[in-house]
């Protein structure tokens, strides 16, 4: 991902220009940046005029780029196993797409890479269902086709542990 920093930056800036993301200059801990969990307080940077935000970027002020989740309403996505799933947008956080060091978050890189590689089906564990609405909103913001999601139950090594490549399963 570090070798493709320019690619991810280009797409993140495109979302800012289209109003689907914003520059955030707030000082949050790295864990808060990565998780998007910071008390769900409204981000004061969310509604900064683009010209003001761009001037701060141009002046060298550190920033992240956050996804601008629509306020109110719902987002529905389809899963091949679970069917249609609808979530309230108010339950979704404005996740970080591009970190202060210019590297993308895993979730943002996934969407960009899957699109650029022509991925049509995304198969993953059901524990990742909660990420799908944000992915959908990103695909829609770019005007890209949304892949077919297939969220499966985890395959278990034993009664307590999922199979894992890390453990040689």
For each predicted feature, which ranges?
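Aromatic/His-enriched, Gly/Pro-containing loop or helix-boundary segments
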Residues: 1-11
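Active-site cores that bind ATP or allylic diphosphates and position pyrophosphate for catalysis
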Residues: 14-169
């Amino acid at each position: 991902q570090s070798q493709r920093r320019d690619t991810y930056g280009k797409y993140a800036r495109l979302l800012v220009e289209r109003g689907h993301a914003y520059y955030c200059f707030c000082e949050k801990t790295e864990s808060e940046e990565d998780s998007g969990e910071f008390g769900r307080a409204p981000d004061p940077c969310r509604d900064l005029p683009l010209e003001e935000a761009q001037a701060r970027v141009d002046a060298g002020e550190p920033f992240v780029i956050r996804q601008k989740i629509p306020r109110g309403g719902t987002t529905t996505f389809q899963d091949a196993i679970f069917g249609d799933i609808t979530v309230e947008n108010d339950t979704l956080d404005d996740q970080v797409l591009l970190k202060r060091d210019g590297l993308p978050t895993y979730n943002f890189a996934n969407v960009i890479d899957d699109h650029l590689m022509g991925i049509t089906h995304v198969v993953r564990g059901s524990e990742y269902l909660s990420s799908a609405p944000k992915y959908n909103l990103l695909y829609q913001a770019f005007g890209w086709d949304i892949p077919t999601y297939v969220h499966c139950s985890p395959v278990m090594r034993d009664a307590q542990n999922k199979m894992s490549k890390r453990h040689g399963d």
